[in-house]
């Protein structure tokens, strides 16, 4: 079985821009991870109408954007449902400036929270750990980089924040997200 690989940030960005969609790769991935972590079905295409409504006034996407969006969705499902938990955020690479990466992280986190809302997350029925993780993400979404401060120190802090975002997301997904049911778990009579 081949491993599903996340498309590169620039590939996703190009496909979205070329399709005339006003959504960044970070926003798209954040939305998808939020919806999946909030309990969206993994077995059908219910994510597409939600994405169309949120990003394109309900209009479908061109085929090239759908292809890339589907690849991002499939890779995200694979990451979030794997035995070894690993989630790579689709944000600008380390080659980009710290400002661009911080903006990408902010977009990602804001859209993750929106993705939870799209699947109608009910906070009153969640654990304290989930509420704390969500509160941390809401705080992180408001963070910014101060150009006057030590950029090397901020770079180190940024990496710690990215790791904390991953932990918060995995905490939320562990409580609310669906898991893929494999054939091995089915009973044969």
UniProtKB/Swiss-Prot annotation:
Of the GO CC terms on this record, one is:
cytosol
Q: A single Pfam family, by name?
A: UPF0149
Family matches, as InterPro entries: YgfB-like, YgfB-like_sf
Any coiled-coil regions, as ranges: none
Tell me the SUPFAM superfamilies matching this sequence: YgfB-like
Gene3D superfamilies in the record: YgfB uncharacterised protein family UPF0149, PF03695
What PANTHER family does its record include? UPF0149 PROTEIN YGFB (PTHR37528:SF1)
The entry assigns this protein to a family as follows: Belongs to the UPF0149 family.
Protein name (Swiss-Prot/TrEMBL) = UPF0149 protein VFMJ11_2207
* Native source species: Aliivibrio fischeri (strain MJ11) (Vibrio fischeri)
């Amino acid at each position: 079985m081949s491993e599903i690989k996340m498309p590169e940030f620039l590939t996703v960005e190009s496909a979205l821009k070329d399709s005339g969609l006003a959504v960044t790769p970070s926003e798209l991935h954040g939305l998808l991870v939020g919806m999946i972590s909030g309990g969206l079905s993994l077995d059908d295409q219910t994510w597409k109408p939600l994405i169309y409504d949120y990003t394109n006034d309900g209009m479908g996407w061109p085929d090239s954007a759908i292809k890339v969006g589907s690849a991002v969705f499939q890779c995200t499902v694979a990451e979030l449902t794997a035995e070894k938990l690993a989630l790579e955020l689709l944000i600008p690479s380390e080659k980009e400036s710290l400002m661009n990466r911080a903006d990408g992280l902010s977009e990602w986190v804001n859209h993750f929270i929106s993705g939870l809302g799209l699947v109608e997350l009910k906070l009153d029925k969640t654990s304290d750990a989930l509420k704390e993780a969500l509160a941390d993400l809401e705080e992180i979404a408001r963070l910014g980089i101060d150009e006057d401060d030590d950029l090397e120190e901020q770079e180190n802090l940024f990496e710690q924040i990215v790791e904390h975002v991953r932990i918060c997301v995995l905490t939320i997904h562990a409580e609310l997200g669906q898991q893929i049911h494999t054939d091995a778990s089915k009973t044969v009579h």
